[in-house]
Amino acid sequence: QNLFTMKKIFKIFAVLLILALVYLRIEIYPQLDLISGFSAKSVASGHFIDGRTLETIQQGDNDIDKVDWATNEINEAERFVTSKVHGLKERKAIYREGLGATLINDDFDISKPYNVPKRNKINNNLPFPYGNLEPKDTVFSNIDYQKLNAVVENAFDKKGQKDKRTRSVIVIYKDKIIAEKYADGFNKNSKILGWSMTKSLTATYFGILQKQGKFYIMKPAPIAEWKNDERSKITTNDLLHMNSGLDWEEDYGKIS
């Protein structure tokens, strides 16, 4: 009787184990490539571009579900990051001056020469927002600064919390900075991942230019390389939507 019971328990255990392995192979294993890839790119950008440590990136950026499975290593000499999940699906992200951090595959030739965009940064001696100098101190009588500062303070997590994860808040009124605050480890020179906020601000600036009559977003995008093929039909409005046209579901809990 005991032998029969043990055999039955063993069979049940074996079936459950097989089901678990099948689930891991079908549902989880394909995600490992994305997890290690995301982690490698995140660490490379945060470390080589913003100068943050691996520890702070792992605790403040990559401490999200599944991404925290990854193990990351930084190669300072050759400026790249490798990430893998329990030894599986290793991915590499490289840093190149002028291009930033790029996730690469096994066929990528790191030694291959590359072109760097020519970016001309013009500095002038005017105060913010018209130049690079510090803004002039201005106090507005119609602003309740105590209430404003309380609102800004409330945008950040209290010590030990990770609910809001706000990195920075800046409030501008009549071209003057009236409130400014940063999370620990960040300052006005930090290079912060913008996500969709970058897209929203870019679209806002083009909207202002359109209202001022200085730009028309429904015209073909002013890109010389696109003028003689089907891309000539792509407008600035299309680009501002940042939509690839691919059919996909924006669900970060599974593969789209």
Regions found by a protein language model. Give the residues of each.
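Hydrophobic membrane-insertion alpha-helices, especially the h-region
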Residues: K11-R25
